[in-house]
UniProtKB/Swiss-Prot annotation:
CC per GO annotation: cytoplasm
Species: Streptococcus pyogenes serotype M1
Name of the protein in its database record: Holliday junction resolvase RecU
Similarity comment: Belongs to the RecU family.
Site (described: Transition state stabilizer): 99
Enzyme Commission number(s): 3.1.21.10
SUPFAM superfamilies tied to this protein: Restriction endonuclease-like
Length: 199
């Protein structure tokens, strides 16, 4: 329909509003992005070499709608992944997992799997530095929890309970978010485990 005198086309306004979808699969992406930016900062300054581990996937079916555009339509995890990140800092092997929750009082232990706990125990046995970064998004607080504290709590009831934030505060270290790096977890490693400053 043309609107005289301006010859504008009137657009229909839909009375149905779009519902906001919550994508639970990507809840931790902003925290993960902050860790990735931190690792990029450490790498660019030659402080540490730490990378996110790729998840091993077996591709089963691929569609080729066009020769230049392959689309994966079916894939499966080939094996259970261990932890999210690994690398080297001052000659020390570093291995850690990152978890995020919206809860204010506890970190759900269902976020941790037995194969991850076993992997962390193996890293500790080889004298590696192993820990978890726990982010409470509602509180805007992040903690560095040594793997041994996580393993000890997990062994109490095979990971069926939630880990209270009081336990995390007592056994871990609060990570102060910054601009560069955003999640300065190497400060905690240096000050509490290696006895110095990473700069």
């Amino acid at each position: 329909m043309v609107n005289y005198p301006h010859n504008l086309i009137r657009q229909k306004v839909s009375s149905v509003q779009k519902q906001n979808k919550v994508d639970f699969a990507n809840r931790g992406m902003s925290f993960e992005a902050a860790i990735n930016a931190t690792n990029d900062y450490y790498l660019s300054r030659q402080i540490a070499v730490i990378h996110k581990k790729p998840t091993p996937v077996q591709i089963v079916k691929v569609d080729y709608p066009k020769r230049s555009r392959a689309k994966i339509v079916e894939a499966y995890f080939r094996q259970a992944s261990t932890t999210d990140y690994c690398g080297v800092y001052k000659g020390h092997y570093v291995d850690f997992e990152a978890k995020e929750t919206r809860q204010k009082t506890a970190m759900p232990m269902k976020n941790f799997h037995l194969h991850q706990i076993e992997h962390m125990a193996c890293v500790l046995h080889q004298k590696g530095i192993c820990f978890v970064l726990l982010h409470f998004s509602t509180l805007k607080e992040t903690y560095y929890l040594p793997a041994q504290a996580l393993i000890s709590f997990y062994q109490i009831d095979n990971g069926s309970k939630s880990m209270p934030i009081d336990y995390i505060r007592k056994n871990g270290f609060k990570v102060a978010f910054g601009a560069f790096p955003q999640v300065p977890y190497l400060n905690i490693i240096e000050q509490n485990f290696l006895g110095g400053d990473y700069n």
